[in-house]
Amino acid sequence: MRHIIAINLQNEAGALTRVAGLFSTRGYNIESLSVAATDDPTVSRITLVTRGSDSVIQQIVSQLNKLIDVVSVEDKTQGEHIERELVLLKLKVRPEQADAVRGYVVRAGGRVIDPASDGFIVELTANEAEIDKFVVDLSQGAQLLEVVRSGALGISRLTRAARLRRE
């Protein structure tokens, strides 16, 4: 099963290497990885996607919690969460198809961010399945020159009570 694991760790040299080393040593695969500082500049957040049974994921979380730089570890897929990924696509488009392709991009929730005479670069932020469909659909009307995906990011949802209070 696919899992999104969020790891907060000290923003120090070697911290990411230790996390990656844990996965490598134990033979676990990282499907996607994103790392950035949090609102606290001394703490970074790693969001990674991996696959495994519940017992394997529990073992991964347990081992991650033992690493010296790790502040917290959470399997986001264990609760309600929102997941997003960014994709950038460089498209070569024939002039007679440009309006149709541009229209599809907008209807799908994407944006043309760099138009050119022979194509454009587009972006879409969505979940993995929506991005997969977007890429396949665009490949029908345009030539995909380059596809760049960020990998998944995940955040736990607010509780229902907290959402109602905010409204």
Task: Please describe what each predicted stretch is.
Residues M1-I4, N8, E12-S44, V49-E167:
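Long, contiguous binding/interaction regions
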